Swiss-Prot record:
CDD domains, alphabetized: MTAP_SsMTAPII_like_MTIP
Binding site for substrate: M189, D213, F214, D215
Protein name: S-methyl-5'-thioadenosine phosphorylase
InterPro entries, per the entry: MTAP, Nucleoside_phosphorylase_d, Nucleoside_phosphorylase_sf, Purine_phosphorylase-2_CS
The protein's role, per its UniProt record: Catalyzes the reversible phosphorylation of S-methyl-5'-thioadenosine (MTA) to adenine and 5-methylthioribose-1-phosphate. Involved in the breakdown of MTA, a major by-product of polyamine biosynthesis. Responsible for the first step in the methionine salvage pathway after MTA has been generated from S-adenosylmethionine. Has broad substrate specificity with 6-aminopurine nucleosides as preferred substrates. Also catalyzes the phosphorylation of 5'-deoxyadenosine (5'dAdo) to 5-deoxyribose 1-phosphate. Part of a bifunctional DHAP-shunt salvage pathway for SAM by-products.
Gene label: mtnP
Keyword match Glycosyltransferase: yes
Record-level GO cellular component terms: cytosol
Amino acid sequence: MSEAYRQPVLGVIGGSGVYDIDGLEGARWQTVESPFGDVSDQILRGTLDGLEMAFLPRHGRGHVLAPSDVNYRANIDALKRAGVTEILSVSAVGSLAEDLPPGTFVIADQFIDRTFAREKSFFGKGLVAHVSMAHPVSAWLGDRVEEVLADLAIPHRRGGTYLCMEGPQFSTLAESNLYRQWGCHVIGMTNMPEAKLAREAEIAYCTVAMVTDFDCWHPDHDHVSVEAVVRVLLQNADKARSLVKAMPAKLKDRPYPLPDGSHRSLDNAIITHPDRRNPGMARKLSAVAGRVLG
């Protein structure tokens, strides 16, 4: 990774209800092209308390993209091209646990990927890589997020398994009960393959899963109005903005590379012999894997 990446640049991917960042100095929407296709939207650039920030609305402004229609590869590639070194991924989820009521923020540290209609890797024919996903998120970044949530007195849980489904329909009762048997804590539609791609791009990634309601396993599920869910969604969005505003102070002394390995996840991952690597693929991966491809 070049010297340009030594200074932290915090990327924020906003999910349902979070479409911008308040208080950015020098705020401007910037188009970033990606060889992997269309990015969800322009990237909002600026500084917050001296920290460079880059915000991307996952579903586009106005929420025009369904989870299956988001080009996750283009989004992560564009954030890497924008200089992002850490990603705070904010998304709305349903709860699969009684002790995670609406309004709780879960710093998920594991995922089960049940998506099936999405491109899940930057690598492929002509340039093959296998990145470890045993620990898919940055423990260091998760620690900083946990500190902020505690400071703000936002109900939260550190650790948990995020079940990512394809959508756009919600789960059946049988599926919801199955995921609970698997030990999952929250269910959503967007953090896979997002977390996998951030790992491949050597960007430290932290999920903040904001519980809006209980999934359909819960006996009260059918009695909760849409208005109540929307109210929690908006309250969560306000809390998420408070979280983002407090993050710069936690990142100013960020070590490089991070001790959890997030900035070095491609070490020994590429297995295609240098003489056999596809030049076109290598050019396409110039941002994602430039550190190891040279």
